[in-house]
């Protein structure tokens, strides 16, 4: 549906025929049989020829590119989940754009048979903002990582959230720099020893959900790479949200930070150490659903349910994703193992006018008031001079 790799250094969308990718005026190999996606940033990705009209499938969203993540990487599970969800959204592939920055996660657009931009470090939200503002009918997805999105890209990340463009931002959090081989990232734990911190990290880590909520994101959620059913449901909910959606995915880097989340994501302990948030339901967890969360003054606490304590589900805090005040969502985002179960699910889902709708309204108002502008007339008006 657009470029696959080398040759397009200008970020230009390439035209695709029935059987191959072609481009006018650009050099380099841009055919489907070209090099693997070790391309320069700024390129746009290409996939297969469009299928005949009809119901799309997961295969229709899989490009012809070899997936080049490390064997066992959590990114495979995320890719699989998103490709499964795409057909159910009912959006034509030519109306979908994936935008990435730099990092392992940023190879993502190459593997989606949609339009895509592989941009520069940390700038995916800025490029996505331009795409959505210029073409509001598109479904725009940003794929980033904890390094790309929260370090050099932190400023763009924050402003994309507060503006509330109708973007879907998926952040792969593995608490490490993977592509550059194991340096600490903004989400690495305090004291963690890495190649760039041999004596331990002395930075305090960013909590991505806290940052997203503080930046006024209207949809905030979290899932786990290996919990495919849950992840797929979260991605689908994010896609249906009108406004910016932010999804953090706990993703295992089995080469440079293996087991970063296994203390609570491993299947045998997950029921006791993960709290699955569900709108309108009490916050209950545990293999036997015998523990819950309630408020004790201004703080949450874990309570034991059952006849011994006389407490039951009615004593637990009931989750409400639609509360406009972000205080409870922020509190939940701060809950962490081992004191609390690790919350996953939708933390916040509220409605607010989107940036692109407000922008379109302003443009319509301006045109109605002063008429449609004439660029040629503007350039040739007023004092002018010629440099010879």
Put a short name on every predicted segment.
Residues 152-153, 159-167, 172, 176-314, ...:
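Glycine-rich ThDP/TPP pyrophosphate-binding loop and its adjacent helix/strand module
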Residues 100-178:
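Thiamine diphosphate
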């Amino acid at each position: 549906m657009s470029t696959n790799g080398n040759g397009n250094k200008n970020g230009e969308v390439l035209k695709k025929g029935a059987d191959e990718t072609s481009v006018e005026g650009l050099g380099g190999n841009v055919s489907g049989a070209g090099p693997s996606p070790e391309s320069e940033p700024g390129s746009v990705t290409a996939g297969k020829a469009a299928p005949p009209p009809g119901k799309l499938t997961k295969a229709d969203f899989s490009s012809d590119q070899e997936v080049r993540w490390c064997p066992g990487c959590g990114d495979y599970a995320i890719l699989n989940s998103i490709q499964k969800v795409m057909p159910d959204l009912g959006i034509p592939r030519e109306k979908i754009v994936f935008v990435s920055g730099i990092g392992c996660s940023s190879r993502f657009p190459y593997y989606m048979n949609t339009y895509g931009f592989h941009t520069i470090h940390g700038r995916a939200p800025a490029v996505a903002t331009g795409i959505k503002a210029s073409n509001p009918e598109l479904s725009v997805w940003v794929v980033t990582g904890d390094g790309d999105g929260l370090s050099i890209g932190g400023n763009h990340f924050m402003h994309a959230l507060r503006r509330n463009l109708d973007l879907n931002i998926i952040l792969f959090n593995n608490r490490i720099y993977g592509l550059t081989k194991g340096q600490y990232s903004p989400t690495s734990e305090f004291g963690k020893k890495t190649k760039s911190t041999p004596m331990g990290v002395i930075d305090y880590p960013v909590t991505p959900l806290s940052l997203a909520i503080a930046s006024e994101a209207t949809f905030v959620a979290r899932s786990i790479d290996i919990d495919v059913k849950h992840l797929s449901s979260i991605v689908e909910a994010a896609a249906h949200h009108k406004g910016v959606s932010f999804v953090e995915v706990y993703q295992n880097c089995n080469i440079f930070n293996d087991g970063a989340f296994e203390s609570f994501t491993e299947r045998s302990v997950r029921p006791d150490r993960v709290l699955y948030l569900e709108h309108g339901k009490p916050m209950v967890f545990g293999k036997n659903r015998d523990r819950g969360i309630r408020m004790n003054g201004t703080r949450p606490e874990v309570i034991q349910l059952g006849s011994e304590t006389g407490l039951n589900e009615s004593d637990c805090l009931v989750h409400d994703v639609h509360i406009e005040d972000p205080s409870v969502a922020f509190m939940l985002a701060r809950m962490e193992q081992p004191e609390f179960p690790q919350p996953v699910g939708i933390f916040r889902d509220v409605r607010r006018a989107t940036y692109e709708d407000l922008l379109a309204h302003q443009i319509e108002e301006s045109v109605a008031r002063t008429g449609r502008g004439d660029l040629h007339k503007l350039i040739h008006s007023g004092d002018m001079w010629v440099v010879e």
